[in-house]
């Protein structure tokens, strides 16, 4: 079976021009392989490490993602064209091997496995060009490799995630509650979010650990685009937070920290040199460059403003898309598709810049809980308490919830409590849309997964049966002591057989709702 905790058989260096002085040093100590890169004149782009080995037994492979997953996680055959960010697992019979890098790496690291061995690519670029190290010694990543025998592949994945992250930042109390996006989709108002808070408080009953009610996109003057000031439908956001607390919920709020259309027009020099092209649902946009000192001050002040308003949870979104110009589903190996652009500070790698941004947000938020959405997973671990692991579920299209929700819960639940608390996204309830039979199963599985449960409920979708089920789910999830494990995930990427607290559970996530053709858009809710 594969073992990469040894000196690589080959090392290759790709620089912006001819390699003049870039060197790579690997050191093995304490059962880890340290990868260092040094250059004075050369500007390295990629470092390639290769371990040659023949796979002699039938082997299945499962890797992680740069940011969220998009219904695309699964165990697959050896395929050298699939590049797996951060880590992967190889399973053969009762043996599972985990290969990856420690969280907080200094570069974007991806792996590939083929029949003749394994390759690790260290993307040390600054944006789309080689980084200017100026003689600095960069720790590009720390490689780890563990072999597990006699335990399930899921348990092996869970243990390996704990190896990769030594100090996760976890909330003092379990996080759960409601979010208005999945029924309002950005069209909301102060009276409606107050109603949401009252409903959430009622569903939580006498739970000592009170739920959050998160105001998602739609509260600011320009939806999804800043500046982060309330529109006339919401008014004073501090008053809303205070009302939430009176009702018995903890206030949460959504923000896109790297996009402010007013600031970008006033200070074009503060923007990234690259314009995001957008997709069929979004227009091309400029975004702020977090290596510009004034931008860092702006981001910090914006986050501090929200905590001063009284919000105890901040959900930040779009940092991967805004920084690199694509959603994770469009990326394979390289974190950014476009070449020829860089951040204002060319002396740091993209990974270092992302980590600095996340630490800035963390520091500005103080004691507030952070949910990171469309964020870089391996660079969020140890900094943020909660991490959205999959693209949006839906209150309208069950195929989307099944593909994006069930899949990400199964394949990233191993990260729960190891990197952060995983957020597999909401149970969305709209009248006349997804059948309660299906949504009920999704609700129960989430509530008993040991990971955060969020619901998004239009009041007209409720009846007494649904209210009772939501109350029971909140009661269960308020403590999050359950343990769940997918049993059929080696051959089913939307697992229906689960082990919950040692008891086997069978779900039917299809019923009469056969998989439908999705539009291909990441925003088709």
Segments and roles (model prediction):
Residues 181-183, 218, 432:
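Short strand-loop junctions, especially beta-strand C-caps/beta-turns
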Residues 186-187, 223, 456-458:
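Short helix/loop capping segments that flank catalytic or ligand/cofactor-binding pockets
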Residues 74-76, 87, 209-429, 466:
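Aromatic- and carboxylate-enriched substrate-binding clefts and catalytic-loop regions
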Residues 123-125, 134-140, 179, 346-525:
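Active-site-proximal substrate-binding groove within the catalytic cores of carbohydrate-active enzymes
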Residues 1-211, 313:
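Carbohydrate-recognition beta-sandwich/jelly-roll modules
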Residues 189-203, 293-307, 439-440:
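Short, acidic/polar
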Residues 199, 206, 220, 260, ...:
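Glycine-rich, acidic and aromatic/proline-enriched surface loops and short helix-turn segments
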Residues 37-41, 87-93, 197-204, 244-245, ...:
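Hydrophobic, Leu/Ile/Phe/Ala-enriched alpha-helical segments that form helix-helix packing faces
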């Amino acid at each position: 079976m594969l073992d990469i905790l040894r000196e690589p058989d080959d090392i290759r260096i790709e620089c912006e021009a001819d390699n003049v002085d870039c060197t790579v040093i690997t050191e093995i100590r304490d059962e880890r392989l340290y990868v260092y890169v040094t250059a004075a004149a050369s500007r390295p782009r990629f470092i390639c490490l290769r371990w040659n080995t023949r796979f002699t037994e039938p082997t299945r492979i499962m890797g992680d993602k740069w940011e969220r997953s998009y219904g695309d996680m699964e165990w697959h055959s050896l395929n050298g064209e699939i590049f797996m960010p951060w880590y992967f697992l190889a399973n053969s019979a009762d043996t599972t091997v985990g290969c990856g890098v420690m969280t907080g790496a200094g570069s974007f690291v991806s792996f590939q496995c083929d029949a003749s061995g394994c390759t690790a690519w260290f993307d040390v670029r600054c944006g789309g060009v080689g980084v200017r190290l100026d003689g600095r010694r960069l720790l590009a990543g720390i490689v780890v490799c563990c072999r597990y025998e006699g335990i399930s592949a899921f348990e092996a994945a869970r243990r390996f995630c704990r190896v990769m992250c030594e100090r996760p930042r976890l909330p003092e109390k379990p996080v759960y509650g409601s979010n208005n996006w999945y029924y309002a989709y950005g069209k909301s108002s102060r009276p409606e979010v107050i109603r949401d808070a009252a409903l959430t408080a009622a569903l939580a009953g006498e739970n000592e650990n009170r739920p959050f009610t998160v105001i998602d996109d739609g509260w600011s003057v320009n939806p999804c685009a800043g500046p982060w000031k309330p529109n006339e439908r919401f008014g004073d956001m501090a008053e809303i937070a205070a009302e939430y607390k009176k009702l018995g919920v903890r206030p949460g709020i959504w923000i896109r920290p790297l996009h402010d259309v007013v600031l970008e027009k006033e200070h074009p020099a503060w923007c990234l040199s690259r314009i995001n092209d957008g997709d069929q649902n979004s227009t091309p946009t400029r975004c702020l460059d977090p290596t510009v000192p004034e931008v860092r001050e702006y981001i910090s002040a914006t986050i501090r403003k929200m905590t001063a308003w009284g919000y105890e949870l901040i959900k930040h979104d779009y940092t991967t898309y805004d920084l690199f110009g694509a959603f994770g589903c469009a990326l394979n190996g390289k974190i950014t598709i476009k070449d020829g652009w860089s951040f204002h500070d060319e002396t740091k790698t993209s990974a270092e810049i992302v980590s600095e941004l996340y630490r800035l947000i963390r520091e500005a938020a103080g004691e507030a809980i952070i949910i990171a959405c469309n964020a870089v997973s391996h660079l969020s671990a140890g900094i943020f308490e909660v991490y959205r692991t999959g693209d949006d579920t839906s209150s309208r299209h069950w195929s989307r919830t099944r593909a994006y929700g069930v899949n990400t819960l199964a394949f990233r639940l191993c990260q729960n409590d190891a990197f952060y608390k995983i957020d597999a996204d909401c149970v969305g309830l709209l009248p006349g849309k997804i059948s309660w039979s299906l949504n009920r199963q999704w609700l129960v599985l989430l509530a008993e997964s040991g990971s955060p449960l969020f619901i998004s409920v239009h009041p007209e979708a409720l009846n007494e049966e649904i209210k009772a089920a939501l109350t029971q789910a909140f009661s269960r999830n308020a403590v999050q002591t359950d343990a769940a494990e997918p049993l059929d995930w080696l051959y089913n990427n939307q697992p229906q057989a689960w082990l919950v607290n040692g008891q086997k559970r069978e779900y039917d996530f299809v019923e009469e709702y056969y998989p439908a053709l999705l539009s291909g858009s990441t925003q088709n809710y």
